[in-house]
Amino acid sequence: MPRSVKKGPIVASHLLAKIEKQKNLKNKKVIQTWSRSSTITPIFVGHKIAVYNGREHIPVYITENMVGHKLGEFSPTRTYRGHNKKDKKIQKK
């Protein structure tokens, strides 16, 4: 179920503070965060945020299309390596 509109989006306060600091800077640094549940707001557009996926921080450049989504959606936690090509069940003749 989506969050109520009157409550507003969930955004980590420390993340907002870091973005406000870099708002007017020319050289924007990558902001590291562990807050995967934070909602992307229009303030985030143009920043690069490194989102933790359980192993490493994956840098994500925020665009206008991402507004309203969660940061964790752009940092996959599981790696898919494909199915075994030499599977004996498939090669039955």
Curated annotation (Swiss-Prot):
Keyword rRNA-binding: yes
Any one GO BP annotation for this protein: translation
Pfam families referenced in this protein's UniProt entry, alphabetically: Ribosomal_S19
GO MF terms, alphabetically ordered: rRNA binding; structural constituent of ribosome
Entry superkingdom: Bacteria
Residues spanning the signal sequence: none
GO annotation, cellular component aspect: cytoplasm; small ribosomal subunit
PROSITE patterns with a match to the protein in the record: RIBOSOMAL_S19
Keywords, alphabetical: Ribonucleoprotein, Ribosomal protein, RNA-binding, rRNA-binding
Biased composition (Basic residues): 80-93
Cited HAMAP family: Ribosomal_uS19
NCBIfam families given in the database record: rpsS_bact
Annotated function: Protein S19 forms a complex with S13 that binds strongly to the 16S ribosomal RNA.
Family in the record: Belongs to the universal ribosomal protein uS19 family.
Name of the protein in question: Small ribosomal subunit protein uS19
Species annotation: Aster yellows phytoplasma
Organism phylogeny: Bacteria, Bacillati, Mycoplasmatota, Mollicutes, Acholeplasmatales
